[in-house]
Each structure stands twice: as C-alpha cells, then as structure tokens.
C-alpha cells in the first residue's frame, strides 16, 4: 500500500521533468555525479563496509547512489515516489547489469513490511523536498536494525547557502535548473539533530562538503555551513 501524505506533488513533478537527463554526466545532475564518490566513501567507511549488507536508499531518484552501493556489493532497495526517475533507474541498472530492487513508495508506507530490516539506510538530498522531514527520519529509524546506520544529507539554511546553492549554482554557474531548491526548506544542523533526537538514532558524526567552481571538485570539510552529511546509529 502506498502512502502519499508526506509527498509534495510539485517536488515530484520537478524531478519527473528532469528524469531523462539523470545519467548524463554533463547534464542537470552533474553535481550529483561529482558528489557521489564522496557520499559513497563516507557511507562505506562509517558503516564498516556495506558489502553483503541490506541497504535502503530513500529518495533514490534515478539511482546514482543506489547503483554505486550495489557495485561494491550491497544488496540495495531504492525507494522513490517519482515514476519517471524510477524507470530511468531500472533501465540504467539493466544496461549496466547491476541488481537493484526499485520500489515506488514512501518511506512511511515501506516501513510497514520492513521494520528493523535493513543494515544501512541512506536518505541523501531528500529531506529538504518533503513536507515533514521528521516523519521520514522516524521511518528510516524504524526500518534499520538495532546497531545499524542511517545517513542523512541536506543543506544548511543561512545566507552563505543561499548565495552558493541558489544564486551561484542555479543562476550564475547553471549547475542546476532554476527552482531546484527552496531556501526556506533547507535544514540547519541543529534542527536536523533535534529531529534525530526524537528517535532512537544517535548522531555519530557530521561532515561538510564544499565545492570549488574553479576546479569542479567536491571535497570534505569540517564546516557544515552549506552542504553536509550526518551519520547516525540506532540504539542497540
């Protein structure tokens, strides 16, 4: 059964329109392709390796992170509410020979049959696109096994993030389509930590990611003032 209460139709439609360019390395999702190796390494290293582990990728879109995790041996389920991105993800997985189970569903509905089922849950660049981030975080917590890891990434809400991710990335550098992000939906680290504290997850680490437009390279940074990730672990 699919649940649609925590879905923003405008957000779904936005990514449906861009779906066909998901795997174009120089297209609208180029930043995600550049960013993905950092995300994958952080997840794999922090979780003590994901080879052979059951992993759920919440808000998987066209499957960039899902595929990379499957390639290093994870057993991956990809979850999204966009039909077009999921079709792109399924087709690309067929073309590359990667085995991934893609499902159209919300995290809340998927939870009903998958409580404490996964070793690792990822929810990357997704929380800022849903009406109720707390609901998604709780669902992720419920689906991971005790002792398992849940990873979140989002964007801080401040003047610097507005300048870099909207004025810079969308309007000046044209790295993203205009309207991709809504600054009001960005989440401060303190706010995300408070949401996590309402669950059985404990924050184990936080790490920022910065982009150099001159070199076109993303790299880790201890500063969480714009893009950042957190690693949480479920209380055993």
Swiss-Prot record:
Cited Pfam families: Methyltransf_23
Purpose of the protein: O-methyltransferase that catalyzes the 2 O-methylation steps in the ubiquinone biosynthetic pathway.
Enzyme Commission number: 2.1.1.222, 2.1.1.64
Family: Belongs to the methyltransferase superfamily. UbiG/COQ3 family.
GO biological process terms on file: methylation
Annotated keywords: Methyltransferase, S-adenosyl-L-methionine, Transferase, Ubiquinone biosynthesis
Pathway note: Cofactor biosynthesis; ubiquinone biosynthesis
Keyword Cell membrane assigned: no
Protein name per Swiss-Prot or TrEMBL: Ubiquinone biosynthesis O-methyltransferase
Matching InterPro entries: SAM-dependent_MTases_sf (IPR029063), UbiG_MeTrfase (IPR010233)
Binding-site positions, S-adenosyl-L-methionine: 39, 59, 80, 124
Catalysed transformations (reactions): a 3-demethylubiquinol + S-adenosyl-L-methionine = a ubiquinol + S-adenosyl-L-homocysteine + H(+); a 3-(all-trans-polyprenyl)benzene-1,2-diol + S-adenosyl-L-methionine = a 2-methoxy-6-(all-trans-polyprenyl)phenol + S-adenosyl-L-homocysteine + H(+)
GO molecular function: 2-polyprenyl-6-hydroxyphenol methylase activity; 3-demethylubiquinol 3-O-methyltransferase activity; polyprenyldihydroxybenzoate methyltransferase activity
HAMAP family reported for this sequence: UbiG
Enzyme category, top tier: transferase
């Amino acid at each position: 059964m699919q649940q649609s209460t925590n879905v923003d139709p405008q957000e779904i439609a936005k990514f449906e329109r861009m779906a066909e360019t998901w795997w174009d390395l120089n297209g609208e999702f180029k930043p995600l392709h550049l960013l993905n190796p950092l995300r994958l390494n952080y997840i794999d290293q922090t979780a003590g390796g994901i080879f052979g582990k059951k992993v759920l990728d919440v808000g998987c879109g066209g499957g960039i992170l899902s595929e990379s995790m499957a390639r290093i041996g994870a057993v991956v389920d990809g979850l999204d509410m966009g039909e077009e991105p999921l079709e792109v993800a399924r087709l690309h997985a067929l073309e590359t020979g990667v085995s991934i189970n893609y499902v159209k569903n919300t995290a809340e509905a998927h939870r009903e049959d998958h409580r404490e089922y996964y070793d690792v849950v990822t929810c990357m660049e997704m929380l800022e696109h849903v009406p109720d981030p707390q609901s998604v975080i709780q669902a992720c917590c419920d689906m991971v096994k005790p002792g398992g890891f849940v990873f979140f990434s989002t964007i801080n809400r401040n003047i610097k993030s507005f300048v870099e991710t909207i004025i810079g990335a969308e309007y000046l550098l044209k790295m993203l389509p205009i309207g991709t992000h809504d600054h009001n939906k960005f989440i401060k680290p303190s706010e995300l930590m408070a949401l996590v504290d309402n669950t059985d997850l404990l924050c184990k680490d936080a790490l920022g990611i910065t982009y150099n437009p001159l070199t076109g390279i993303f790299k880790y940074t201890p500063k969480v003032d714009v893009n950042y990730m957190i690693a949480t672990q479920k209380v055993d």
